[in-house]
Amino acid sequence: MRCPYCGGLDTQVRDSRPTEDNTAIRRRRICPDCGGRFTTFERVQLRELMVLKRSGRRVPFDRDKLARSVDVALRKRPVDGERVERMLSGIVRQLESMGDSDITSQTIGEMVMEGLKQLDDVAYVRFASVYRNFREAKDFENALAELSQPELAQSDDVKAEGGAEGGRDKPKAAGKPPRSAE
């Protein structure tokens, strides 16, 4: 594997172990040329997915782009990285098992929103504000109302699949208690 620091091609694996959820292999590598250390992940890819954008363009699915958009929504939020990784892996598994290699960006966005709703309310609203292109304060109010009434925002596809995390994490409460403004 090419070294991200110096471009050397002769990197060596120092440590290799499965991730906590056993969906990938984490490898620590070192470059003998520059001494740089970095981590790589090896994952199974069941099929080559293509994303159908709103503009009609088809682009290859990029898990890293999905992870970056989720990271932006979760920036400075107290959410464990392993939970985020489980959510992302669950979404990718769902996409790969849908049986179609062409997936709409809307389908991906709805799955991410459902996953974020279960991880962190603030991240959910942040992601929704970009994904749904909020223009005014009323849009935020509607998103907050969806959080207090979880059944309104779920798509039927995601509900049928058991949520973006495959239903493995905590069961969802019927409703969230109101928060005090402290």
UniProtKB/Swiss-Prot annotation:
Alphabetic keyword roster: ATP-binding, DNA-binding, Metal-binding, Nucleotide-binding, Repressor, Transcription, Transcription regulation, Zinc, Zinc-finger
Molecular-function annotations in GO: ATP binding; DNA binding; zinc ion binding
Protein name stated in the entry: Transcriptional repressor NrdR
Keyword Electron transport listed: no
Skewed-composition ranges (Basic and acidic residues): 12-24, 156-172
Organism of provenance: Xanthobacter autotrophicus (strain ATCC BAA-1158 / Py2)
Cofactor section: Zn(2+)
unnamed Zn finger ranges: 3-34
Lineage of source species: Bacteria, Pseudomonadati, Pseudomonadota, Alphaproteobacteria, Hyphomicrobiales
Residues of the ATP-cone domain: 49-139
Similarity comment text for this entry: Belongs to the NrdR family.
GO biological process terms on file: negative regulation of DNA-templated transcription
InterPro entries: ATP-cone_dom (IPR005144), NrdR-like_N (IPR055173), RNR_NrdR-like (IPR003796)
Function: Negatively regulates transcription of bacterial ribonucleotide reductase nrd genes and operons by binding to NrdR-boxes.
Cofactor info, note text: Binds 1 zinc ion.
Cited NCBIfam families: transcriptional regulator NrdR (TIGR00244)
PROSITE patterns, A to Z: ATP_CONE
Region listing for Disordered, in residue ranges: 1-24, 146-182
